[in-house]
Amino acid sequence: MGMRPTARMPKLTRRSRILILIALGVIALLLAGPRLIDAYVDWLWFGELGYRSVFSTVLVTRFVVFLIAGLLVGGIVFAGLAVAYRTRPVFVPSNDNDPVARYRALVLSRLRLVSVGVPVAIGLLAGIIAQSYWVRIQLFLHGGDFGIKDPQFGKDLGFYAFELPFYRLLLSYLFVAVFLAFVANLLAHYIFGGIRLSGRTGALSRSARIQLVTLVGLLVLLKAVAYWLDRYELLSHTRGGKPITGAGYTDINAVLPAKLILMAIALICAAAVFSAITMRDLRIPAIGLVLLLLSSLIVGAGWPLIVEQISVKPNAAQKESEYISRSITATRQAYGLTSDVVTYRNYTGDAQATAQQVADDRATTSNIRLLDPTIVSPAFTQFQQGKNFYYFPDQLSIDRYLDRNGALRDYVVAVRELNPDRLIDNQRDWINRHTVYTHGNGFIASPANTVRGIANDPNQNGGYPEFLVNVVGANGNVVSDGPAPLDQPRVYFGPVISNTSADYAIVGRNGADREYDYETSTETKNYTYTGLGGVPIGDWLSRSVFAAKFAERNFLFSNVIGSNSKILFNRDPARRVEAVAPWLTTDSSVYPAIVNKRLVWIIDGYTTLDNYPYSELTSLESATADSNEVAFNKLAPDKRVSYIRNSVKATVDAYDGTVTLYQQDEQDPVLKAWMQVFPGTVKPKSDISPELAEHLRYPEDLFKVQRMLLAKYHVNDPVTFFSTSDFWDVPLDPNPTASSYQPPYYIVAKNIAKNDNSSSYQLTSAMNRFKRDYLAAYISASSDPATYGRITVLTIPGQVNGPKLANNAITTDPAVSQDLGVIGRDNQNRIRWGNLLTLPVGQGGLLYVEPVYASPGASDAASSYPRLIRVAMMYNDKIGYGPTVRDALTGLFGPGAGAAATNIQPTEGGAPAASPPANAPAPAVTPGSAPPVAAPPVPDGSVTLSPAKAAVLQEIQAAIGAAKDAQKKGDFAGYGAALQRLDDAITKYNNTK
């Protein structure tokens, strides 16, 4: 019986077709329009930065990959459909109840749509997915050799880094394409009658059999290739219960042979499948496929499991020894922990120290950091904010400069940025928000070893940082009293100013100056941006594009935008670096520095791999998490790596946004590959100026990854490694408010790398014994230009108290707890413990230092800024405690120990001005034992004092005597009261006629 006539589809009128086309056009515009606008804006932005080649290279690469992958997958699927259609049976028996006949008629009526539309849709999807792998493809095209061969196959590591990922990608796409072609061919033959399921056995046409078995055979061949590549991936895979990343005993002696056996079986099965092309019997290929499946279960899974349970587990330490050695070597290479970088030295950790030995460690004791950058931000806000819209981040940064005497000091530094989210009332108006309040103003630095005066009570004047300020002053001139001269303190780019939903500012001269700049006693002064950065928006096309980009009609109608106007956007320094170098992973810490009289943000960039043979696979998020990262929500991306290099140092100019990339690691093959992909974008290391090199620091995230790996991979013996008996732990932060690991600390101290008493800027961390609270090691990474990147590990053999035990001993000391109880006034005042520093001093000793802060009231109100109230120390089992570093050192080691910490300058006046910042900050005092006040001149015999002045002088002398007596007795409350009496008496003396 023949087929029923096909029901005709109703024809569309011309008007209907036009309406459908318009609707499709609107939908396409809504879908593609925003992407086209973003692409055009990015083209403008990259061009303004001078990195348009990056944009064009990425765009062209993505497009070419999209095109090739789409054509490959879509073409194979189309071929499967086309061949099935061309070889369809001429006559297909059918009846009125045949459901396939309806589908056949529908497909034939829309043959072009189905035969072309389906492959195109699949090709588009495949291309969209494939273009996201442009990084892998560019590395394949430009990757080179590492100069290191893997220990199993003898291949250069460049094969694993650059070639193997591409081969895997290509194989995956071929497998998907052939599988989809098989499905399409199968359905086409079924619809067109090449496959019929009627009757007891059904029927299969010759052409259908040939095409389907050919596609199945190709799939089996691709599986054989996959088995071959699996061999290489064994060297970087992880398996439960295995102590290392990479191939272990079972992998090499069972899994690896199994892969070769399975590959051979797959080739035999492929031949069996292809045999069905000439033989009508399909039982042979079916048997072959079943054999392959059973072999994968028995040979691929069963045999390795038997070897693991019977041979390896009873003798695991010996069996895995060779492969653990491979992992130790590879992990050290991959994470920059080889012997030419890391130096191990024995260190007792509990040696006795004399006062003279401690005093001789001037580089350490004169630089003991009292300012905790996670605590003192409210003090910066209190004294240096100036206006409600200026802002300091909750966590400040640490950098180093030479002080006025040429000594290396570390400073707590911050940029006074504008925070658009703190604008209020009329300040939030679009014109004010984006054209008036456009920039921050000022670089603030506080010597980390210094506070202004001594506070024995949170309500007293003292205990706050000394502020060195670079700022536009009240007369419009740049006040440059900071640690280095600065020509332009205005800040248009930074992490705070960009942290808003509408991150842009419109600048440029259009009539009178309109950007808020500073205030005099009588008026507000405005400013006009003159930097090179910014995208011009003077023409109507640009205004229209940005109106669409930010969904803001004021771009079109506001008269504040003129022919010279420019727009600054994407102002976050780290995001700018990630945009121009999309192959970099940036450090979570961005810090400001003055370099050659310019204010710049410095960002560390990493190149990474996730398939370095035998190197441990590490999660950046978990490895870099510490109490600061958790508290301030600055966790690194959840990215797994087995190779990392701090290959790039980047700077972003805070005024004009210029991004500069410098090569830091000249040996990194990954960086070399990317420098070929994007030639001219990364400057050679030789272009790093000496001024910039002085502010480059060893990056925190890299150090945290390395210290976590050193906890295991400092072990040389594989048997000891397997037993974990000599492993270390990263200590938990002992602060009761913390909930994660103790962060590493930047300090200026004696030079651990050179093992001498010169001053060195370094990043340090204590390490505990495995699952214990005793110290195992002390790690220091040098940031000095001459020894940059050298890591020194002081291994500590005895039972030396770790950070938690030291903190417990300090906080529970009766004298400490009693004194802080008085200061806290039954929790009316808030006591906060600062960072617990671990400092090598003397000839083999370790000094713990923990500053204590107090703020009035128990709240976190901005006005309740913390003041340094005490300094607590511990050396061996002895506690030192006092208002100053010198007092605490003297309590520990005796008189003279704090000689280097007595650089006291007279403090004149009270607190620094809060708004605007003081143009000339008053001298500060490094806490010592002397009262932090300016003593009146002692009259000689030729000077006659008035009776009132003479009486006040006696009060001063009495207060000094009381302070000395209280200090000798260790009466800190009495000492503080005497200092307050002295302060009041001196003020009274100066005001007495």
Curated annotation (Swiss-Prot):
Enumerate the residue ranges of region (Disordered): 903-941
Give the location in the cell: Cell membrane
Q: How does it sit in the membrane?
A: Multi-pass membrane protein
Top-level taxon of the source organism:
Bacteria
* InterPro entries per UniProt: UPF0182
Q: GO CC terms on record?
A: extracellular region; plasma membrane
- In which residue ranges is the amino acid composition biased (Pro residues)? 929-939
The answer to whether UniProt assigns keyword rRNA-binding to this entry is: no
Primary location class: membrane
Keywords per UniProt: Cell membrane, Membrane, Transmembrane, Transmembrane helix
A Pfam match is: UPF0182
Cross-referenced NCBIfam families, in alphabetical order?
PRK00068.1 (NF000825), PRK12438.1 (NF009097)
User: By its UniProt entry, which PANTHER family does this protein fall under?
Assistant: UPF0182 PROTEIN SLL1060 (PTHR39344:SF1)
- Family of this protein: Belongs to the UPF0182 family.
The protein's name in its UniProt record: UPF0182 protein MAP_3291c
Organism of origin is Mycolicibacterium paratuberculosis (strain ATCC BAA-968 / K-10) (Mycobacterium paratuberculosis)
